[in-house]
From Swiss-Prot:
Residues 219-269 are annotated as: Self-inhibits the anti-apoptotic function. The BIR2 domain is required for caspase-inhibition. Residues 110-134, 231-257, 312-343 are annotated as: Disordered. This is Baculoviral IAP repeat-containing protein 7-A. The modification Phosphoserine is found at S231, S235, S247, S251, S254. Changing S254A: Abolishes phosphorylation, but no effect on caspase inhibitory activity. No effect on protein stability or anti-apoptotic activity. Keywords: Apoptosis, Cytoplasm, Developmental protein, Metal-binding, Phosphoprotein, Protease inhibitor, Repeat, Thiol protease inhibitor, Transferase, Ubl conjugation, Ubl conjugation pathway, Zinc, Zinc-finger. It comes from the Eukaryota. BIR repeats lie at residues 43-109, 148-213. One of its GO terms (biological process) is protein autoubiquitination. SMART domains: BIR, RING. Auto-ubiquitinated, and degraded in a 2-step mechanism; a caspase-independent first step and a caspase-dependent second step. Phosphorylated via MAPK-dependent and CDK-dependent pathways during oocyte maturation. Phosphorylation does not appear to affect caspase inhibition or autoubiquitination activity. Residues 324-333 have a biased composition (Basic and acidic residues). It comes from Xenopus laevis (African clawed frog).
């Protein structure tokens, strides 16, 4: 174990790279260097890129002790004091090493005074007030459990899932098939199967929901997220070639870039059909600029769609401007007349039109296939993507610019 604080060597350059514009002055009174990692669940998610060759301690122990994964290698950083540790060895305990090298850490000191306190309670004591959490629900009219339960009056007989359990877990029935939504975070789930536990699914897909955190606590979310890390499905060896296509055309190009494809968020994007090189590039860029990875598939997909659009625009301009041998050696052929403005607008409107109702604009991205072909009103009626016929597990709202 060796110490590497943010005030030494490479630490200074890293701080200058990652701290600018991320609330250092605002949160200084709280003693937080990385406020975005103040949640234990969020710190645990950062370890999705933790090298599999690294020995213990486990990501769960790291996150519980205030550390999130910084990289490269086995470098971790405390969200509160900014202390960085690396060169972990078997038998090392994160809390012990934290106390050994950074004894003045505010988070560590408060944790020692109140071992049972959650991150949110500790942060509230840092600032002398309640933790900064907005409890503005997306659907405040469904904040009462009895109102959510009333929404299940027309719950289909064929649908799996107990309405009382679903309502108690924050979900209300949307009125379409077996689609439910969380009143607070707007997270939507469908295609319920026998044995699915609403709270577990809530923590699996929407771990940052404040209602979930308030009712179940960080320990529950941590256990659910930890089970995802240990799941055989997350192992590269068990993933199909359609996810990890190692052909030169799609390879990110370097072992360092390959590391960014190990997270569950990256794997979901790859399953949607996005290029490995583009996914790795975006995740790597975000990590270098902010010091953290994407926390949700929707954020990554939004950036991927923008990046693809920019790439296509650049390629079309390059192709139109690049002369070819044929253009220099042969007389130009008659080209089709340019499209009128009205025709261009008609085609653009047609591309953005919902392929089901043929009326409203497309706005819902299906998971896991990634197709964007229907509007908000038509999406709940579908169980399979109309393009590829893949089963729809979830959907993400997309905003067209």
């Amino acid at each position: 174990m060796s110490r590497w604080s943010v005030s030494q060597g490479c630490g200074n350059s890293h701080k200058a790279l990652t701290m600018a514009g991320h609330g250092e002055q605002l949160f200084r009174g709280w003693g937080m260097v990385r406020p975005s990692m103040r949640s234990e669940a969020e710190r645990l998610r950062s370890f999705s890129a933790w090298p599999r060759t690294c020995p213990q301690p486990s990501p769960v122990e790291m996150a519980r002790s205030g550390f999130y994964y910084l990289g490269p290698g086995d470098r971790v950083q405390c969200f509160s004091c900014g202390g960085v540790l690396r060169s972990w060895e078997p038998g090392d305990r994160p809390d012990t090493e934290h106390r050994k090298f950074f004894p003045s850490c505010t988070f560590l000191q408060q944790q020692q005074r109140d071992p049972g306190a959650t991150d949110s309670q500790i942060l509230g004591q840092h600032s002398g007030e309640e933790p900064d959490r907005t409890w503005e629900s997306v659907y405040p009219e469904m904040a009462e459990e009895r109102d959510r339960l009333d929404s299940f009056r027309n719950w289909p007989m064929y649908a799996h899932g107990n309405p009382e359990h679903l309502a108690g877990s924050g979900f209300f029935y949307t009125g379409h098939r077996d689609n439910v939504k969380c009143f607070h975070c707007d997270g939507g789930l469908r295609n319920w199967e026998q044995g699915d536990d609403p709270w577990t699914e809530h923590a699996k897909w929407f771990p940052m929901c404040d209602f979930l955190l308030h009712v179940k606590g960080e320990a529950f979310i941590r256990r659910v997220q930890e089970s995802l890390f240990r799941s055989p499905e997350s192992s590269p060896d068990s993933l199909g070639s359609y996810i990890y296509d190692r052909s030169p055309a799609s390879s990110p190009g370097s072992p360092e870039s390959w590391r960014y494809l190990q997270s569950s968020v990256a794997q979901d994007a790859l399953q949607m059909g996005f290029k490995q090189s583009l996914v790795a590039s975006l995740i790597q860029s975000k990590f270098l600029l902010t010091g953290s990875s994407y926390s949700s598939v929707s954020d990554l997909v939004t950036d991927l769609l923008v990046a693809e659009e920019e790439t296509h625009s650049t390629e079309s301009v390059s192709v139109s401007r690049a002369p070819t041998r044929m253009e220099r050696s042969e007389p130009p052929k008659e080209s089709a007349p340019p499209l009128s403005t009205e025709e261009q607008l008609r085609r653009l409107k047609e591309e953005r039109m919902c392929k089901v109702c043929m009326d409203k604009d497309v706005s819902m991205l299906f998971v896991p296939c990634g197709h964007l072909v229907v509007c908000t009103e038509c999406a709940p009626n579908l169980r399979h993507c109309p393009i590829c016929r893949a089963a729809i597990r979830g959907s993400v709202r997309a905003f067209m610019s």
